[in-house]
Amino acid sequence: MHHEVMSGLHVNSLRKHEILRKEQLIAALFVSGKSCKGEYLKLFYQKTVSDVKSRSPAVQVLFAVSKKNVPHAVSRNRLKRLMREAYRNEKQQLFTLCDEGRPEMSGIHLQIAVLYIGGRKSFPSFELLRQEISRLMHNIRLSELT
C-alpha cells in the first residue's frame, strides 16, 4: 500500500504541534475570526502573518464539544476523536491552500476551531462528520486568506 509522504511525515497524520493550544490565539480566533456553519459543526478560522520565520505549522486546529450540548464525558470524547479523525483525513485541502512552497503564502498561518453544535439526541456518523468538515474547509477561500 502506497502512502503519500510530506517532509518525511505521513500527510494524514495529526502531529502534536498542529493542535492549537495558545490561549491568546484561541481568544483572537473567536473574537476576530470568520466562521462557517454546517448541520453538526461550526468552523472558526483566521489567518495570522508573522515576519519572523515561525516554527509553528502553517495550519493549527482545535476541537471542542460543549458540555451543555453533550453532557456525558464519554460521548464528548468520542465526538472529539471522530472530529479529529475526520479532519486528519481531509486536512490535505488546507495544506494545498496554505502551501508553504509558494512565496505569497510565506509567513501566513491559519488557525481553525472546529466546534460541535449538534444536539445530544443522536450523534452523526464518522462519514457525515468527514463530509461536513470537507465542505466547511472548502468554504475557506484562498482570496479570504491572502
Swiss-Prot record:
SUPFAM superfamilies on file: Ribosomal protein S5 domain 2-like (SSF54211)
Function of the protein: RNaseP catalyzes the removal of the 5'-leader sequence from pre-tRNA to produce the mature 5'-terminus. It can also cleave other RNA substrates such as 4.5S RNA. The protein component plays an auxiliary but essential role in vivo by binding to the 5'-leader sequence and broadening the substrate specificity of the ribozyme.
Gene: rnpA
Keyword Hydrolase applies: yes
The keyword Transcription belongs to this UniProt entry's keyword annotation: no
Reactions catalysed according to its record: Endonucleolytic cleavage of RNA, removing 5'-extranucleotides from tRNA precursor
EC annotation from Swiss-Prot or TrEMBL: 3.1.26.5
The protein's name in its UniProt record: Ribonuclease P protein component
Keywords, sorted A to Z: Endonuclease, Hydrolase, Nuclease, RNA-binding, tRNA processing
Entry similarity comment: Belongs to the RnpA family.
Domain of life: Bacteria
UniProt record, GO biological process: tRNA 5'-leader removal
Single Gene Ontology MF annotation: ribonuclease P activity
